[in-house]
Structure formats: structure tokens, C-alpha cells
């Protein structure tokens, strides 16, 4: 990732963001949930859930609300993870 600086030119340490699908996969596995059943419970096809785990799909507001209802982890948290990841990717692309 490229360096990020404030207006005074001081380098800022940016945390490494990860795709929220990675965290979701860990959460599902820790709870002992079956992936196919979980996909149905949040209104996704199993293949789409798999793509989410791999970072090939994003968590949008609808999915975030479904995750909140199913897992008890706020929609804002899921969207925050997605936003942090998206910003990191955008910064990397700008600094290439």
C-alpha cells in the first residue's frame, strides 16, 4: 500500500483493511453454521456467498442488514468494514 500523508506532510499509519468476507467466513465457522443454510438465511445463493468470502463480492446495505438480523452484528459494522476495504484498494490504485 502506498504511503498516506496529512496536509503537513507527516506520514500517517493506515491500518491494513481486509475484505469483510474474510471476517464473515471466520464468524460463520466459529459459530458452526453450515454455509449453504446460512446463504439461504440471508437471501444469497451459496455460490454468491462463496464469492463474498473470497472478496469477489461486496457487502451492500441489504446484505449488511441481513447479517445484522442473522448474526447480531450491526449493519453499520459490516458497511464500515466494506468501506475501509474499498478505501484501501482505491488508495493503492491511486499510488500505483
Question: What spans do the regions from the language model cover?
Answer:
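A short, Lys/Arg-rich alpha-helix, primarily the initiator
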Residues: 6-34, 80
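Short alpha-helical DNA-recognition segment
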Residues: 33-51
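Short, charged recognition helix plus adjacent turn
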Residues: 79-96
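Short, compact, well-ordered microdomains
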Residues: 68-69, 77-80
